[in-house]
Amino acid sequence: MKKKLSLLLAMTGAAVLFAGCSTVQYAGGKELNGQVITASGTSVAHVSGYASGLYLLSIPLIVGSAENPDTITFGEDSVNVTAVTKMVTKKSKELKGSKTIDLVSMTGSTNIPIPIPFIFYWKTATVSGNSVK
């Protein structure tokens, strides 16, 4: 019984340690130092979005919410390019950009070998682009 309880506590601790997160950040105005970041239109900002989370095989457990950045959610599959792109373009629109160009994305998945290999995965997705008027 104590062994099972210890394992449960260890797994809970690992889940909290690897709790999902999401964020959207931007650099605009003075952060661009007067540089033009696009060949057409007026530069508004460079916007970057990130989401990560813990998965059991392909089932999302604790992930960062793409709907509400900087919060976590349970069971929502938001660690993918589609969800993070929506997060980036939403922020671009909030910054009064009429379009988001030069989108670049990256995804990653890392196996967590404890307690059983190839069961738990840490997934990440990043998208960035330039907001212009």
State where each predicted segment sits:
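Bacterial Sec signal peptide processing site at the extreme N-terminus
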Residues: 15-37
